[in-house]
């Protein structure tokens, strides 16, 4: 797999919350934080480095759209295990206000992460956000306050305050999640 670096190096701004247009159907509806952590290997606070990349789809033809990634710096692991200091995250969508990766809009995010994969035991490299927008919360206000980005999961909490909102424990390792395959 090849990574292609793209031009943006600007970081998001505090208080900005991306708006992601939901143009597809969802295979799974997330209603609780437990739903998110059931499919996650880690919950982290991460900041965009400003770098983006793409990976070609290995099973497609030359016309297949590449998968866009945003590089994130890990600030804190809230639940689960993640030892890397920087990771590539599959972009959960584009911010309809900027046309760029939604992960470049805010200064900091609370992300429910799972290994990115094509199929069971076929990792794509990097991480994906559980449920795309559903597992994405953007910092707004104080450094420990995060608001829901997803507009299509009304049952999820509208905001999460670190230290005050209970984040359910992670029950599966990356290996276990890879063995199960994508959700």
Label each residue range with its predicted role.
Residues 38, 64, 81-82, 102-105:
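Extracellular/periplasmic catalytic domains that process cell-envelope and extracellular macromolecules
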Residues 58-91:
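OB-fold (S1/OB) nucleic-acid-binding surfaces
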């Amino acid at each position: 797999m090849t990574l292609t670096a793209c031009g943006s190096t600007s970081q998001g701004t505090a208080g900005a919350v991306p708006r992601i247009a939901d143009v597809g159907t969802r295979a799974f509806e997330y209603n609780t934080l437990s739903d998110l952590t059931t499919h996650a290997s880690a919950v982290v606070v991460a900041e965009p480095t400003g770098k983006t990349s793409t990976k070609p789809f290995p099973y497609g033809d030359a016309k297949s759209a590449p998968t866009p990634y945003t590089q994130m710096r890990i600030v804190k692991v809230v639940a689960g295990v993640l030892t890397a200091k920087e990771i590539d995250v599959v972009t959960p969508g584009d911010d309809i206000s900027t046309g760029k990766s939604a992960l470049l809009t805010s200064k900091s995010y609370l992300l429910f992460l799972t290994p990115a994969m094509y199929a069971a035991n076929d990792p794509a490299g990097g991480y994906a956000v559980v449920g795309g927008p559903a597992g994405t919360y953007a910092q707004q206000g104080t450094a420990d306050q995060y608001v829901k980005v997803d507009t299509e999961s009304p049952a999820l909490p509208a905001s999460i305050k670190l230290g005050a909102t209970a984040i359910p424990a992670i029950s599966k390792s990356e290996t276990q999640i890879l063995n199960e395959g994508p959700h």
